[in-house]
Amino acid sequence: MEKFVLFAPLIASLIAGLGWRAIGEKAAQYLTTGVLFLSCLISWYLFLSFDGVPRHIPVLDWVVTGDFHAEWAIRLDRLTAIMLIVVTTVSALVHMYSLGYMAHDDNWTHDEHYKARFFAYLSFFTFAMLMLVTADNLLQMFFGWEGVGVASYLLIGFYYKKASANAAAMKAFIVNRVGDFGFLLGIFGIYWLTGSVQFDEIFRQVPQLAQTEIDFLWRDWNAANLLGFLLFVGAMGKSAQLLLHTWLPDAMEGPTPVSALIHAATMVTAGVFLVCRMSPLYEFAPDAKNFIVIIGATTAFFAATVGLVQNDIKRVIAYSTCSQLGYMFVAAGVGVYSAAMFHLLTHAFFKAMLFLGAGSVIHAMHHEQDMRNYGGLRKKIPLTFWAMMIGTFAITGVGIPLTHLGFAGFLSKDAIIESAYAGSGYAFWLLVIAACFTSFYSWRLIFLTFYGKPRGDHHAHDHAHESPPVMTIPLGVLAIGAVFAGMVWYGPFFGDHHKVTEYFHIAGAHHEAAEGEEAEHATAEAPVEHAVADTATAEGEAAAEAEHAEIAAPVGGAIYMHPDNHIMDEAHHAPAWVKVSPFVAMVLGLITAWTFYIANPSLPRRLAAHEPALYRFLLNKWYFDEIYEFIFVRPAKWLGRVLWKGGDGAVIDGTINGVAMGLIPRLTRAAVRVQSGYLFHYAFAMVLGIVGLLIWVMMRGAH
């Protein structure tokens, strides 16, 4: 079954992409959609029936050369099971939604066949992500990692007639190459130090890596910290963290279903998954974890500030994704990997619903995306309105404080903020502020879109209509997850340390528990006279057990938490004001948004006029694009022109053209003049040749 889940989307993609002329475009759409729903059902069966014990499922010997051996295998553990349901559920619903959304696309003419290609790309995207999350070694993961990058390039640039779409696709691809270079260096370093790319073998050697110093860039580094940092650079690119985030908003150039798939289930979650998968390494790399916390918290704050002033409905949600990913990285950085995965799971439901809801709004408004041209749509598209409301309740964290009752984001985001309080004061305060901003821009979206009087094109508003059932049914399914996912899975993900340990089969935990029980049992039954053991024997056994525990501890579970990692327990005992602070931030953001856009709609304009520098700073996304244009893009273009004109044009082409059009014609003209046709000229040349040969022979004889 696991192999079917992995390879079925690939087969469907190939049939739809290469064989749609034979089976028909409509059949290609239904084939890919049906296969994804079947994979989704199997994934849920695997998730619900999984006992937590990791399994290794071989597929084939992939790379065998010299001493290097890498097989293609499926690693099925709790992390994999979670990602399987996230990827296949969202992808199946996006496929279904796309049947309606892509039915009539104004970017294509009636005689252009684009639907089969689109669905083939979607299915290939899904396969690449499944390849990534089921990987049993870093090479296999990198294959899926790059496959996701290629698929995102194809889908972001799907409207290839638009220059902006082509530019966005190139930007996403190039920025991710920067992160991928760091990921590759990390893989090379791990293989160089451990001799393997297989996860269990790497994890087995992590304690030794933590005690190893290596020379890199003219200074000594702790191996575990350096490798953790390099791997996280790859995660920064894929998950659009600060400094490598600039591609994510531009990715909105692709069709809206693509945005839902990228932001909720596939590409951007890959970085979070990578850090959680490599938790045994990060538990021995404290400096790398601190770096993750700083980047994650700063990204959450940065993206939330930019989202305050965005007017494109899709870009608002895009920046919310960037911000929420920062939350996940903070959780992973402080060592509560289960909380990071918890938020990844709940976020998939409400973020996919928000994007698909935005697509429904855009569909109703004839592809208008500027929220300033919306208004009063809640009566026109009531199903979409309620779906977006539920998504907003979830992302802003609506729930009952100090209880486990609330929408999905209420429980998962609060778990991260409480963990941040226990692990990093810097991250805690930035996340609370970001929660307030998240509430503000989320309710701003709701108020501008669904409340007030119609603005902009009144013809579009008058003819606005609800989306067909094929588009609203996925919204309803996702709404169920956005409401109940947090309450259902709070316990095994964060609620109790013992439950989390059992659920994720945390490496070393069961071994230690078993040893403790055996020791207690032996102590209770052993006679007093046998309680005193031979000192040397006891010390030898203790040393052997310590050595065994040190080697085995990071291996055998979905995640690993060091015995000294007590952040989750400390988070559970955080003060009440810490647990209530996200709710207060949410209410403050809601009240501010209501004041700005319902009670006093002229206030935002006046405030922007009063603080123009701050407004432009946020509207221009902290000027990251302009800074990168000045520091990287222009110098790169200048260097490219120099190498093109001076290197390729002047040196390479100049040399070849100079020889071909200058030297060779002159030599041929000289040769023509030598061929005079007179016999005595040829005889004289022969005599000169013979004389020359004789002189050469005599000179060699003299030596």
UniProtKB/Swiss-Prot annotation:
What keywords tag this UniProt record?
Cell inner membrane, Cell membrane, Membrane, NAD, Quinone, Translocase, Transmembrane, Transmembrane helix, Ubiquinone
Spell out the InterPro entries in the cross-references: NADHpl_OxRdtase_5_subgr, ND/Mrp_TM, NU5C-like, Proton_antipo_N
* Example GO BP: electron transport coupled proton transport
Q: List where this protein forms a coiled coil.
A: none
| Subcellular location(s) of the protein | Cell inner membrane
Which reactions is this enzyme annotated as catalysing? Answer: a quinone + NADH + 5 H(+)(in) = a quinol + NAD(+) + 4 H(+)(out)
NAD as a keyword of this entry, yes or no, is: yes
Any Gene Ontology CC annotation: plasma membrane
Q: What is its main location?
A: membrane
Q: Origin, by domain of life?
A: Bacteria
Q: Which family does it belong to?
A: Belongs to the complex I subunit 5 family.
* Assembly information from the UniProt record: NDH-1 is composed of at least 14 different subunits, Nqo1 to Nqo14. The complex has a L-shaped structure, with the hydrophobic arm (subunits Nqo7, Nqo8, Nqo10 to Nqo14) embedded in the inner membrane and the hydrophilic peripheral arm (subunits Nqo1 to Nqo6, Nqo9) protruding into the bacterial cytoplasm. The hydrophilic domain contains all the redox centers.
Q: What is this protein called?
A: NADH-quinone oxidoreductase chain 12
Lineage, opening ranks:
Bacteria, Pseudomonadati, Pseudomonadota, Alphaproteobacteria, Rhodobacterales
As recorded in Swiss-Prot or TrEMBL, the protein's gene is named: nqo12
